[in-house]
C-alpha cells in the first residue's frame, strides 16, 4: 500500500492546514536515519487490533503537522498515549522536545518501540502500562504536554482524567473521532453541547485544529477524525469543585430533555437554581459554562 494519501484526502488536509497556518516542526540538529515505518511494521508483524481501538496513522507528513500543534517544544516533555508502531512518535522526536514518553499497553508494540528507543537513548522512554491506570503527569518534568492519537475506545475517560489535573499540562493536542472533538468544542444551544463541552471549556480553551479523513489511517475507521487542541487556563478548580461540577453536569445532561428543576432534583436543584438566579424551566443545553460553574460552586457549598 502506498504511503501517499489519496487525492481527496490531500485536498481536505491541505485546506485544514492552510486555515490554521500551522508552522512546520523544527528539526533537531542531528539527523537519525531510521528504517521506513512500513518496513518496521512488517518486520515486527504488527497490525491494528480492534479490541484496543487502534487505527495506525502512518503518513509522516500528517504526523509532523500534528506534532507541530504543540508549538515550540524546546525544553518541553511530551507524553504520547498509544503510540502503536511509532509514526507520531517519530515526528515528536523530530522536534526539539527534551524527552518523549510513550505509554503503550499493547505488548506486541513494545519490541518495535524499544528498537526505536535505541536511536534516541536519552530522549525516548517506553512506558509499558495502561494509560487509564497511570498518572501521566508523574512521567516527566514540567513544562509538559500530551500529543497523541488516542485509542477511540478510551479517549473520553482519558481526557476527563487529564482535565481533573489540568494544571499539570501546558497543552493537550489530542486526536479523537470527529464527533467527540466537536462535542469538546461545542457551544451552548447546539446539539453537540453537553457534559464533555462544559468540563473541557471550564478548564481550558478548546479548538478543533485539524480534520483528518478515514483514508489517512490503517485500517481506515468508519468515521472522520480530528485533533482538538486544549490549552488549560492559568487558574484551575480545586479537586472538590471539579467533583461538584461532575455531579451537576451528570445530573443535568443525564436527562437533558427535562427542565432543570426535574433533572437536578437529586442534588437539590430547586434551591441551587434559585440561588444561582437560573430559571428552573430551562434545559441543560441552554446554560453557559459560567452558569454551570456557579451551580457547581453552590453545590459544593451546600455539602
Curated annotation (Swiss-Prot):
Keyword Nucleotide-binding: no
Catalytic activity, EC: 2.1.1.182
Record GO terms (molecular function): 16S rRNA (adenine(1518)-N(6)/adenine(1519)-N(6))-dimethyltransferase activity; RNA binding
Residues at which S-adenosyl-L-methionine binds: 55, 57, 82, 104, 130, 149
Main location: cytoplasm
Reaction catalysis annotation: adenosine(1518)/adenosine(1519) in 16S rRNA + 4 S-adenosyl-L-methionine = N(6)-dimethyladenosine(1518)/N(6)-dimethyladenosine(1519) in 16S rRNA + 4 S-adenosyl-L-homocysteine + 4 H(+)
Region (Disordered): 1-34
Role, per record: Specifically dimethylates two adjacent adenosines (A1518 and A1519) in the loop of a conserved hairpin near the 3'-end of 16S rRNA in the 30S particle. May play a critical role in biogenesis of 30S subunits.
Name recorded for this polypeptide: Ribosomal RNA small subunit methyltransferase A
Organism of origin: Gluconobacter oxydans (strain 621H)
Organism placement in taxonomy: Bacteria, Pseudomonadati, Pseudomonadota, Alphaproteobacteria, Acetobacterales
